[in-house]
Amino acid sequence: MKKTGIFLYAFYLIICTFCGLSFPLLRENINYLYLFIPAFIVLNLFVGVFSAKMPSLRLRVCRHGALLLAVFLPSACVAVIHHVVLAFKMIPGDWKNWLWHALFAFGFYFVIFWNGIICVYLTSAQLGIRQRAIGLICGLIPVANVFCLVSIIKTTLREVKFEAEKEEINRARSDERVCATKYPILLVHGVCFRDSKIFNYWGRIPRELERNGARVFYGNHHSASSVAFCGEELAERIREIVRETGAEKVNIIAHSKGGLDCRYAIAKCGVSDLVASLTTINSPHRGCQYADTLLTVIPNQVQDKVATTYNKAMRHLGDISPDFLTAMSNLTASYCAELALELDDAVEKHGIYRQSVGSIMGSAKSAGFPLNYFYLIVKDFDGPNDGLVSDKSFEFGEKFTLLTPKTRRGISHMDVIDMVKMDVPDFDVREFYVDLVRDLRERGL
């Protein structure tokens, strides 16, 4: 924390403690209200709100709430100790006066706490449902509530600090347009998801790339269908982007099954001359061994029921001919082995720059459902994995980058595309993609 920040925090802490313990002064001289009311207003409305480094109102409000809670906790502890000591002096002889002291302090800190907690609960992107729920459950449990509050304060202060630093980085390099590649970027989603304006599959990544000069487009293909069907869709989408932008080619960044779909589009659908580069992210190029087994042991009627339900739902969301079972079978190790024989030489001979990225989780606790369960299944079959795909299946192209865990959390199949917009310790996913696209730019692509 910088010196200015420490000074402001100490200033707010003093104001908060003064107000919380000011009942005797107000009782003796009502004119102290002229100090109390402005101090109360400053604490509840202006702490942390005015910051030029905060890129949005949401983060300014989050910072306000986090600082308010950070001030509340030590100040409230001082107030509790003060009133316990006071109780020994005033009870039983002057218990009514002590009660008024305590009620005044309780009312003051009640407002401060709820102001802070409501602000962070409504605006923090990093608290998550689990941490919010634990906070609500433990709120009335002594000692546990203090630990929960400390955790909430740490999470939200870390969030606003991180976002402020990112804003500073982006402002400093805004003129460089480090992601302004020669050819536009095409982001291709994986299986069981669709491109949507409401929910962005790629989280905060597209906005970060665009802010740094990139032109970003989406695949807009089926959520689940065969590699061949999706490949045809993507080939048409590539032609559409080329016509729309006037660019000669596109740079493709594809996640999961999207990597297989793009390889097929390049090799089989006549768009090899329209693709400058292909970057696959956690794609199962050698398939998933556990998928072969699951499709064998799960009864056909169960598979058909799941597929029918999924396909029906996806038709309502815009897919014309979803095919869940074929999509799943195209992720098996046996199918991908056959596919590789067809596609590898075809993609390589067109002179397209090819690279791949993979990541692995540290443990089953590294991600939520269903990746936490699949991590254990995949580990039994194939060893280290990202919750869905084994590390043995990622590598493709001239360059391979394996993102290994620097902490026990690791990086999951969803973390690597920022799907849930949760920051991963020691891995800035947005900056990773900025560097990825910057490298394409430096290669003249």
Question: Can you annotate each of these PLM segments?
Answer:
Residues 2-9, 19-32, 189, 216, ...:
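Serine-dependent carboxylesterase/thioesterase catalytic core
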Residues 199-200, 288-294, 365-370:
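Short aromatic-enriched loop/helix-cap "lid" or pocket-rim segments at secondary-structure transitions
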Residues 1-198:
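Flexible, membrane-associating and regulatory peripheral segments of lipid-active enzymes
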Residues 177-249:
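Active-site catalytic motif of lipid deacylating hydrolases and related acyltransferases
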